[in-house]
């Protein structure tokens, strides 16, 4: 098949999808092997990124591709949409998300064992934001739910796959959680002292 036609097919499929399309899907629909799919799309990415007249690019996300607007045009593109109230993630939610990202799939009990505190609220928030999802149940008493990160997580944080996650040891996460817990305790103690003096 002609290369330009193949690029047009991939571009049309990614545009129509509006979401990530897996390499397997692109390969099975076009009848082109996965290696060639990757080569063609990586070539398209280079073309898009080197052409300032193009407002779009293709992002690789977790063994798939998505057609996206270029980040440098964000200030213009955001004006097309109604302003939305977007609340950031709390420290607790970020800790929980990091634990899930590095240990997926993982149960709530294990998350709470690592954090040392209840994580219901953080997990609910992450589910609402589609950064994590249920990934089945552990084959253990009570059949606890397992959690894992989603494609939205990779998209939001700019990672292609697990291989792009910064390298941390579980001990680093434990230390960060402990530091944050100590910091919260210090804030609470300071506030209590102020109230006692007043």
Curated annotation (Swiss-Prot):
Cited HAMAP family: ScpB
Disulfide bonds: none
Assembly, per entry: Homodimer. Homodimerization may be required to stabilize the binding of ScpA to the Smc head domains. Component of a cohesin-like complex composed of ScpA, ScpB and the Smc homodimer, in which ScpA and ScpB bind to the head domain of Smc. The presence of the three proteins is required for the association of the complex with DNA.
Homology family: Belongs to the ScpB family.
An example Gene Ontology biological process: chromosome separation
Record organism: Acetivibrio thermocellus (strain ATCC 27405 / DSM 1237 / JCM 9322 / NBRC 103400 / NCIMB 10682 / NRRL B-4536 / VPI 7372)
Domain of life of the source: Bacteria
Pfam annotation, one family: SMC_ScpB
Keywords associated with the record: Cell cycle, Cell division, Chromosome partition, Cytoplasm
Protein name per its UniProtKB record: Segregation and condensation protein B
Keyword Transit peptide applies: no
One GO cellular component term noted in the UniProt record for this chain: cytoplasm
PANTHER family: SEGREGATION AND CONDENSATION PROTEIN B
Organism placement in taxonomy: Bacteria, Bacillati, Bacillota, Clostridia, Eubacteriales
Entries under InterPro entries matching the protein: ScpB_csome_segregation (IPR005234), WH-like_DNA-bd_sf (IPR036388), WH_DNA-bd_sf (IPR036390)
Biological role: Participates in chromosomal partition during cell division. May act via the formation of a condensin-like complex containing Smc and ScpA that pull DNA away from mid-cell into both cell halves.
Subcellular location: Cytoplasm
């Amino acid at each position: 098949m002609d290369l330009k036609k193949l690029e047009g097919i991939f571009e049309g499929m990614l545009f129509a999808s509006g979401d990530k399309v897996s390499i397997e899907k692109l390969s099975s629909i076009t009848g082109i092997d996965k290696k060639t799919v990757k080569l063609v799309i990586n070539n398209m990415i280079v073309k898009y990124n080197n052409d300032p007249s193009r407002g779009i690019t293709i992002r690789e996300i977790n063994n798939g591709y998505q057609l996206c607007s270029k980040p440098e045009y964000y200030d213009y593109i955001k004006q097309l949409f109604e302003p939305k109230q977007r609340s950031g993630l709390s420290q607790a939610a970020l800790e929980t998300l990091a634990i899930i990202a590095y240990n997926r799939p993982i149960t709530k009990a294990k998350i709470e064992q690592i954090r040392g505190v209840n994580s219901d609220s953080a997990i609910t928030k992450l589910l609402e934001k589609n950064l994590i999802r249920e990934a089945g149940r552990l084959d253990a008493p009570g059949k606890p739910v397992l959690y894992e990160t989603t494609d939205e997580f990779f998209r939001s944080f700019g990672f292609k796959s697990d291989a792009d996650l910064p390298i941390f040891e579980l001990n680093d996460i434990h230390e960060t959680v402990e530091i944050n817990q100590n910091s919260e305790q210090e804030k609470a103690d300071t506030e209590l002292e102020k109230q006692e003096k007043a």
